[in-house]
Amino acid sequence: VDGGGGGERRHVTAQIQPEDLPALAEAGFRVLINNRPDHEVGHGENDAAMRAAAEAAGLEYHYNPFTPGQITPDMISEQARALASPGPKVAYCRSGNRSTVLWALTRAGLEPADELIATGAQAGYDISGMRPLIESLASRGR
């Protein structure tokens, strides 16, 4: 996913490693959003390790873990805050799908559901099952 309004770079990806972060910073990214819960990863990829590596690479770091089937309004709000940080950003989880879902939910009501789902599909993520939630959030003004 590369989008989200304003022409600013927003990307999602599968799990990254601490040693990948200097290259992300060199590529121009400024913000790293970790959507992977600690219980899914080893010690070297947990929140503390990723935060330390991100800070060492000069990246702003946000931890917003998303366990499948457990989306909350606070989680969507936190993702929106992280995505509002200045500069190019990258969010990740195991496959990139959960980060794509959260991105789409933050855009509910700002962009049509069809466009959000199509953007996810163009990046290789099928988030069509989230349509009812996207439309519900949009109808409530998220």
Which role does the model predict for each range below?
Residues 1-13, 20, 59, 138:
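Mobile, glycine- and charge-enriched loop segments
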Residues 13-82:
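Cysteine-based protein phosphatase catalytic domain of the PTP/DSP
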Residues 6, 28, 85-86:
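Residue-level preference for short coil/turn positions at secondary-structure junctions
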Residues 76-110:
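Catalytic cysteine-centered active loop of the rhodanese-like fold, especially the PTP/DSP P-loop
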Residues 109-142:
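Cysteine-dependent PTP/DSP-like catalytic domain, specifically the C-terminal lobe
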Residues 8-10, 38-40, 105:
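A generic structural signal for short
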Residues 48-51, 107, 111:
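Glycine-rich, phosphate-binding/catalytic loops in enzymes
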Residues 4-6, 34-37, 101-102:
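A short, structure-level motif marking secondary-structure boundaries and short turns
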